[in-house]
């Protein structure tokens, strides 16, 4: 694999394009992409965002704290659709995310928030995430 966080942006871009073209040829309904990026370090997250361009339908920011949400918005000029991560691990943190940024925050590792996350995905992606009988993941999860 390519250590995309440590190569120059042009090299990263040259590596990403054939991968995205191959994925496009497969005509997937959705593509979930994870990009580790810091606005303060050259991790090539911005390159990936540029390459995906108008194909981005939903952006979920996993932020370390509520103030990082504002910092990422300012540094990348990107307004995420949802905030998760340590910035949402308490109700006070979720409230602060919403107060500072106006964005919804959901603690996706809290089983009680599973329904809220499902509703968010259904609304944002325009699909139904209802369980299909007998379609449980391995291990019953």
Residue spans for each PLM region:
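P-loop NTPase switch/communication element
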Residues: 1-8
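Conserved catalytic-core segment of NTP-binding enzymes
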Residues: 11-22, 30, 35-117
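Active-site charged/polar residues at nucleotide-handling catalytic sites that mediate phosphoryl
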Residues: 26
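C-terminal helix of von Willebrand factor
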Residues: 112-133
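Intrinsically disordered, low-complexity segments enriched in serine/proline and basic residues
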Residues: 132-134, 138-140
């Amino acid at each position: 694999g390519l250590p995309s966080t440590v190569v120059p942006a042009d090299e990263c871009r040259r590596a990403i394009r054939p991968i995205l073209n191959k994925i496009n040829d497969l005509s997937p309904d959705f593509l979930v992409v994870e990009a580790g990026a810091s606005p303060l370090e050259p991790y090539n997250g911005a390159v990936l965002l540029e390459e995906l361009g108008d194909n981005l339908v939903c952006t979920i920011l996993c932020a370390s704290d509520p103030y990082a949400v504002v910092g990422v918005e300012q540094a990348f000029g990107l307004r995420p659709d949802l905030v998760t991560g340590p910035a949402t691990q308490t109700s006070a943190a979720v409230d602060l995310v919403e107060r500072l940024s106006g964005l919804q925050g959901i603690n996706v590792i809290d089983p009680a928030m599973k329904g809220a996350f499902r509703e968010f995905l259904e609304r944002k992606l325009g699909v139904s995430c209802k369980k299909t009988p007998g379609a449980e993941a391995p291990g019953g999860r």
